[in-house]
């Protein structure tokens, strides 16, 4: 397989959707796995063989080929696995592509997909792949043409929350494959070092390659508290930071003029967000929060890496009502999304919180 050149590391709406989905894979797709395999649906090994990939390199540098023995597990419903792998090859060749390229395809394909989990006991070799995927890459497995195999492509993403490689097989195979090829061909036309592009008469520049600019939206402090246990006092935190927004065609689509200088935030388990936020992420504005590395930055990053997300709530005088924040390790930055449908998002968030509070009271 030909390597795909890595694009410039800008932050766009599509990539933001993918990063958020990556962070919430466990909540959206893995949370229903029962602790006791004898209860409810279980996972069954449906394929065993070799997973092969090359180092993600730029330009014409030598590449190293890696191979790891692994197995693929799928959910079993009514005694039958969701995926039929009878005609799959014994070796799956994986192409590493930048998440930004994959994000342009559209996260609707990941939502309307079947899921599998890759497992391997060869930790040292597998860590090489995990490291690459934690650095801004995803895997794409192309299946050879076979009339007896109805699978054309599988997308592989690493879920840090559950320390697992999760594969997605889009249900709309034809549309996904066509869109993937369009994006890959567009990426190959973009060199690692950008130079002015001259539109060709027979091939005008694709719409998806419009420039994305990160514009400063707000500067202030983020305030939250943590508590190690109920017996210990809470600790207040304050992080000086700036919020940038990804804009196209010079229009940010949102104003922060009425945002307070001190932004209050509460931490909550990201699984709460994962129960309902997928539908809102697609219709949201993406922001990126940057701060100087330090004790407070590391404290918040540690909390979010351990399974928390941030919810910044504003007063009734502010047009924007809520911002959700997640931590992106590859960028060492906090990504946020502002739902366009603020009222319904806040309503659904309250419902989910009330449900969990009621469950907690019932256990007492």
UniProtKB/Swiss-Prot annotation:
Descriptive protein name: Protein PTOV1 homolog
Region (Disordered): 187-207
Family label: Belongs to the Mediator complex subunit 25 family. PTOV1 subfamily.
Cited PANTHER family: MEDIATOR OF RNA POLYMERASE II TRANSCRIPTION SUBUNIT 25 (PTHR12433:SF11)
Biological processes annotated in GO: positive regulation of transcription by RNA polymerase II
GO terms under cellular component: mediator complex; transcription regulator complex
